[in-house]
Structure formats: structure tokens, C-alpha cells
Amino acid sequence: MQISHIIKKYDEKTVVNDVSFSLPKGKVTSLIGPNGAGKSTVMSIISRLIAADNGSVVIENKDINKWNSKELSKHLAILTQTNNIQMKLTVEELVAFGRFPHSGGRLNSKDKEMIDKAIDYMELETFRERFIDELSGGQRQRAYIAMVIAQDTEYVLLDEPTNNLDIYHASNLMKIVRRLCDELGKTVILVLHEINYAAFYSDYICAFKDGKIASFGTVEEVITKENLSSIYNVEFEIMQIKGKPLSIYY
């Protein structure tokens, strides 16, 4: 995926300003930065939820705006910050939505196999017949990720997936993200506020400030005292824990 010179304005305010980068295939890339830095807007443009005013996003050598929605949904899946489905659905019914781009609502044996695999992968078998609104926050988030797995796309986009999760469920979710890449070969793009989750579980980090890319590279290249202090305007110290540069800020 290649993002080239994208610009987005709301009225007179430029929220994304000439952003360009490539997403490495089969890797986890996290978008980080302060509130209002433009990272979620970039994610929305990449997933075609909103249109850029200028620039392009290219997937498989084809501009994202030239894909029809059904075909694009076979290549790219997104889980947004708010996923409030206004229907009484079981876990299995929710996960089945992931097969809609493939089946058009008429599930065949291949679709059912993918649904079963996704439920099993996310360890949701005991919740299969439970209604979504009966689940805890962590269980519900796993169900939505199972839906994304069932969709079976190369690119998986997750916008602040750890929002509203406690430490236990958030860390478990990040382990799942890592498995999506390592075990299933997905290219995963996340928006994260928690810098240490980005540092520990990502392969690459794209850091934003004021609508522009402040730093892009491997975790070790981006997570430095100088970079983070400049981006967030607070003091940082970096410690190596299990071979990862984790940050302390104050």
C-alpha cells in the first residue's frame, strides 16, 4: 500500500498535510501522535471512509477510489473506534458479517468454514450463541476482530482498538494483533495512543504531529528520547525491556 501526498482540510484547517509513506506487507505498523495530529484521519482516508482533498492511496497498483466497494472489501478490512450495531446479534451472526463481501449474504460451505475458524482462533466458541450486548468489553472486541478475520483480507486496519479496555484486555488484544501478522500473514495498521504498546508489538511506527509525519521507521528508529519529546512536548526516558525500547514520560 502506497500513500502519496494526501491532504485533508476541514473548512480552513488542514488536518492532514502532504502525508506520504509505504506500508510494509506482512508487518504491523502503528500510527501514533498527540490528539489532533491527523492519525485517525489518515486511517479513514486509507480505508476510504472519507476522501482526501488531494493525493492518492494505492493498493495492489490500483488507486483506492477505482476499486468497487465489494472488491475493496476483499482486500481491506477496518475496525473503527465505535462499533455499535443496532441489532440483536449473536457472536456467530456478527462474525458472519465478515463474509458478506464474499457471499453477498448467502453463506456457502467455504463461508461457514471461515466463520468457524475465526471463532475458534479468537477462542469464542463458548460465546458463539451469546448476544453481543451480553459480552464484556474485551469479549466484544474479540468478536469484532473475529469478524475481521472471517473477512479474510490482506490488510487489517484497527483504529484505537485498545480504547476503553483495561490493561489485561488491552494487552491480550495486542498479542492477538501480533498473531494476525505472524500466524496469518496479515498486514496490520493500527492507530494507538499507548506508545509502549506500539513499541512492543509493532514492526514499524509512523509518528504524526500537526498533520504531518514527524518520524517513520522501525520501532528502534522512532522510539527515541529526542523524537518522542519533540512530538509530544513532554520529557521522555527510554528503557530497554525484553529487547524493546519502552518509554517513561513525566
Task: Give the predicted meaning of each segment.
Residues 156-160:
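Catalytic Walker B motif of ABC-type/P-loop ATPase nucleotide-binding domains
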Residues 131-135, 139:
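Conserved ABC ATPase signature
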Residues 32-34:
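The feature captures the beta-strand-to-loop junction immediately N-terminal to the Walker
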